Amino acid sequence: PTEQDEIVETVKHLIKKVGCKKKTAIECLFPFYYLIKQMQYFGGETLVTGVAADGHFGLSKKAMIHYSKDDQKFKKFRQDYFSNLESAGTKRLIKLCELNKINLCNPYFEPSVFSLWIDKNWQELNKPRQKEVIRKYYPELDDLKIKPHTNLQLGDSKIAHRVGNAVISKYKLNAKSPIGIYNRIAKGIYA
């Protein structure tokens, strides 16, 4: 959506009904809100996602800086990541699906998928390309010239920019960040 009021109402829903508290949670669940609405329109019942896939490969900035060079730290990072439903907004995505009576299939959080790669180090998974352990089986992907990992909300989707600007324009034109506005929505200051 591009209409400011529709974006703001969606943000309010994600904060008040789904329980999003962080800026990244709002931005990451924003497209799922509309995807689920389209699924309902067309009679879809099950949402299959790739959410949390990057956790297996340690492609976040934090993981690449702090865990990619030490095998034990990398393994511990992934064990912690996948033992916490807050990772990758999974808990909130589950709630959004429940509220809309959509079944969620999130295979990257399944123990069978976790066990595939937990004993591999960062280099084994990501050299010479990110996610090499998978990509080597799909040479047709090479033609797509896939760029290195970019967070969904920060890449060319412009979700963070569009959502942030909508709430800033509605509530506080001189704000540099939407975080304070999100907090006020959560507290009920902005109805």
Enumerate the language-model features and the residues they cover.
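A structural signal for alpha-helix termini and helix-coil/disorder junctions
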Residues: K17-C20, E140, G188-A191
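ATP-dependent adenylate-handling ligase core
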Residues: P1-M39, G58, K62-Q72, N121-L125
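Acidic, carboxylate-rich catalytic segments that either coordinate divalent cations
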Residues: K172-A191
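PAS-family sensory domain signal
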Residues: R78-F82
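A broad, structural surface signal
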Residues: K37, Y41, S115, K136-P139, ...
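Mid-to-C-terminal catalytic subdomains of enzymes
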Residues: L47, A52-Q72, N84-A175
